[in-house]
A protein has these predicted regions:
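Ligand-binding loop in jelly-roll beta-barrel domains
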Residues: 93-118
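Short acidic-glycine-tyrosine-enriched beta hairpin
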Residues: 78-93
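Short, charged/polar surface micro-motifs in flexible loops or helix N-caps
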Residues: 39-41, 49-53, 71, 114-117
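Short, conserved beta-strand element in jelly-roll/cupin
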Residues: 47-48, 58-74
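Short strand-coil-strand connectors
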Residues: 39, 75-79, 102
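Structural motif
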Residues: 64, 71-73, 80, 96, ...
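A short, N-terminal "cap"/entry segment at the start of jelly-roll beta-barrel domains
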Residues: 1-45, 55, 120-121
Length: 121
């Protein structure tokens, strides 16, 4: 049983998450770190260093990105926009999408619904 679940099997009403891991991988590549997972959703942090590639594939889940810091372009559904702090992006399940032209280290909050079914690490 995880710390997110009471002995009665119900999910705790509140979870405090140490989300201080906004660092890219040691080799300078993009890094996703899952911070929270319950059946209905998962949340994590995604860091892409300036100049690095975003090599993710489409997911089976709906996804929301919130840009915390940095600057990049984002393409999905045939549209490209500037991704800057405060930008919130919704990507439907199975939609091809990508961050590119990362000119400043990019840090994002990421939410999947239902919970991400891929390998979170």
């Amino acid at each position: 049983m995880s710390s997110r679940t009471h002995a009665n099997g119900k999910i705790n009403p509140m979870e405090i998450v140490d989300a201080g891991r906004f660092l890219p991988a040691a080799d300078g590549t993009a890094r996703y770190v899952e911070q929270l997972r319950v059946p209905a959703l998962s949340a994590g942090t995604y860091s892409i260093p300036a100049g690095a590639a975003d090599n993710q594939e489409p997911h089976a889940e709906d996804e929301i990105y919130v840009v915390v810091s940095g600057r990049a372009s984002f393409t999905a559904g045939g549209r490209t926009i500037d991704a800057v702090p405060g930008t919130t992006l919704f990507v439907p399940a199975a939609e091809d999408h990508r961050f590119h032209d990362v000119t400043e280290d990019l840090t994002l909050l990421v939410f999947f619904a239902p919970a991400y079914s891929g390998d979170p690490d």
